[in-house]
Amino acid sequence: SDLIFTDDWRSFPRPPLVAHIIWEGEDVYVINNHYKCCGNGIIEDDEDDEEYRRLQAIKYTKDYFENSLVNKNLVLVGDFNDELSDEKTNNIYWDFISDNSNYRFVDLFIACNQSTDWSYPSWPSHLDHILISNELFNNVNFVQTIKLEQFFSGSWHEYNNIISDHRPVGLSL
């Protein structure tokens, strides 16, 4: 495992972790991220703007994929802290979304459907995503938000206090 972008705290306050794994004899690179939180939903041309910082992180991540991990099995996961369903002008993911022959957010259908399935129910919003490269498009079995609070006697309140304010999003290949 390696940390990337360790020298760019503005775009990556928490450097992404790249894990190289072998899955069914294939090399797979899983990149876990936690992008900058908060903001007002509008990308402003200001290096301190939260959406601008996330947009830069997305651009650098895509460049990293296209220069360092060309034609590799890629899975980008984590807390992206932004909505996939934003309009194009304020959608930090547009570089990936518009490049749909090479990349796919496999949880887009969750983001565009009922809030009961979203990953961040206390807001409510869907901020945790999974992006895959085209090498894995045909390997997706299912994607879902995992409602772990169902396994706690205190339901969401207990899960939120003990584990996280986010639900995990799972991908089966």
What are these regions (language model features)?
Residues 1, 31, 41-45, 86-90, ...:
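Short, solvent-exposed loop/turn and secondary-structure capping segments
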Residues 1-36:
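Structured beta-strand-rich core segments of catalytic domains in phosphoester-bond hydrolases
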Residues 5-13, 65-75, 81-173:
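Metal-dependent phosphoester-hydrolase catalytic domains
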Residues 11, 52-60, 163:
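Soluble or luminal CAZymes and related metallo-dependent hydrolases
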Residues 29, 54-77:
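His/acidic metal-ligating clusters that form di-metal
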Residues 34-36, 80-83:
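Catalytic metal-binding/acid-base residues of hydrolase active sites
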Residues 37-40, 148-150:
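A short local loop/turn or secondary-structure capping micro-motif enriched for an aromatic residue
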Residues 39-53:
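Acidic/histidine-rich helix-loop elements
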